[in-house]
């Protein structure tokens, strides 16, 4: 869990989620395929919510490799797990940063978003493209 956003708030939310008997929490890296395979084979989830990411526009300028590892490679592994274990649904978070220099407000999903202004936004837009292609190629809802 990164400290880019308030860790106390994250822990409080996680505590609430853990009260649900159908919620399983693991700490690790989304790049850890051994851990991901253990989790998927043990629980066989029917819904996967992928929120893991290295966040932050400014930090992506200083440390772009962490965005490659977490956002690109990590998301690739989540998509591969979905291809292998076939959950009923895979939900992924993106960011408004993908809209880049778009001036039309309010933002909406049908707007063009091909002008990312940060490496963070570029990795998240890449995640969207990867997820779209996996959904099409491997019938992942």
Regions found by a protein language model. Name each.
Residues 1-141:
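N-terminal Rossmann-like NAD(P)+-binding domain of SDR-like oxidoreductases, especially those catalyzing
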């Amino acid at each position: 869990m990164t400290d880019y956003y308030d860790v106390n708030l994250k822990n409080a939310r996680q505590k609430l989620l853990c009260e649900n008997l159908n919620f399983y929490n693991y700490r690790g890296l989304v790049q850890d395929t051994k851990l991901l395979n253990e989790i998927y084979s043990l629980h066989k989830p029917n819904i996967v919510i992928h929120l893991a990411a290295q966040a932050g526009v400014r930090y992506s300028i200083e440390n772009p490799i962490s965005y490659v590892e977490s956002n690109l490679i990590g998301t690739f592994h989540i998509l591969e797990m979905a291809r292998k274990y076939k959950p009923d649904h895979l939900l992924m978070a993106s960011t408004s940063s993908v809209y880049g220099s778009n001036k039309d407000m309010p933002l909406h999903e049908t707007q063009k978003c091909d002008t990312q202004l940060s490496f963070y936004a570029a990795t998240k837009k890449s995640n969207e493209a990867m997820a779209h292609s996996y959904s099409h190629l491997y019938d992942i809802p």
